Amino acid sequence: MKGVSDERINAPVRGPDEIFEASRLTGDATREDLESIRRRTSVYVYEAPVRVWHWVNALAITILVVTGYFIASPLPSMQIGEATDQFVMGYIRFAHFAAGVVMSVAFFGRIYWAFVGNRHAWQMFYIPIFNKRYWKEFVFELRWYFFLEEEPKKYIGHNPLAHAAMFTFITLGITFMMITGWALYAEGAGQGGVTDSLFGWVLGYVQNSQRLHTLHHLGMWAIVIFAIIHIYAAVREDVMSRQSMVSTMISGHRTFKDDRIE
């Protein structure tokens, strides 16, 4: 989409206090930007690789959570005959490992796109901790989610609260789960392999296998809680803030459903 899309995504940085956050809140845009958004109602934000990664990652996490739960709490055997003939847990473990590989490869692809994509592509990989404006907007969003503000602010990318959540639970969370997950895989694969060479140090650092399993399991529950809140917040904002959320991750366009943009 031409016009406001290109202007917003390719606009030069105007100052350290204005665009530390890639989200570029519309309430702080220029008068011309606001009028363009009013006329066109839509801004192209998320490129195709970002959207594909989002849904691939969501599917991989779903498989990892379900299979990971059963690995930690195996099903009681209800089969008749030898367990080796049924191989139920073997299939569950294989699905877990396969989904872990997919998530890992996709995450490295996402890191690559952060460098070559538009400025929204790298938003989740950092937090502008020294930007006072960011934290002011962060507090506002907290108040909005707790129903202490009457009107929402609208953002082109992630709002500051979502920005912090994505960095914490996706960027750091996935990194943590990959490191601990591959370390557990390396333990089972044995010494001398590639995974042991890359991740064998983790077990030594944690000091025992059970602690490593526990940390990985707790990380799973943290991501589950984040996913539930993430889905709730996306649907809530779609309805209450009058700007698209769910459809944006399908089409790539952020649609503003009314002209209340400040």
From Swiss-Prot:
InterPro entries: Cyt_b561_bac/Ni-Hgenase, Di-haem_cyt_TM, Hydrogenase_cytochrome, Ni-dep_Hydgase_cyt-B
Gene3D superfamilies: Transmembrane di-heme cytochromes, Chain C
Example of a GO MF term: heme binding
One example of a Gene Ontology biological process annotation: respiratory electron transport chain
Transmembrane segments: 52-72, 97-117, 164-185, 218-235
Membrane topology term: Multi-pass membrane protein
Record's subcellular location: Cell membrane
One Pfam family per UniProt: Ni_hydr_CYTB
Coiled-coil intervals: none
Domain of life: Bacteria
GO cellular component, one term: plasma membrane
Keywords for this protein: Cell membrane, Electron transport, Heme, Iron, Membrane, Metal-binding, Transmembrane, Transmembrane helix, Transport
Function: Probable b-type cytochrome.
Annotated family: Belongs to the HupC/HyaC/HydC family.
NCBIfam families, A to Z: CytB-hydogenase
Name this polypeptide is given: Probable Ni/Fe-hydrogenase B-type cytochrome subunit
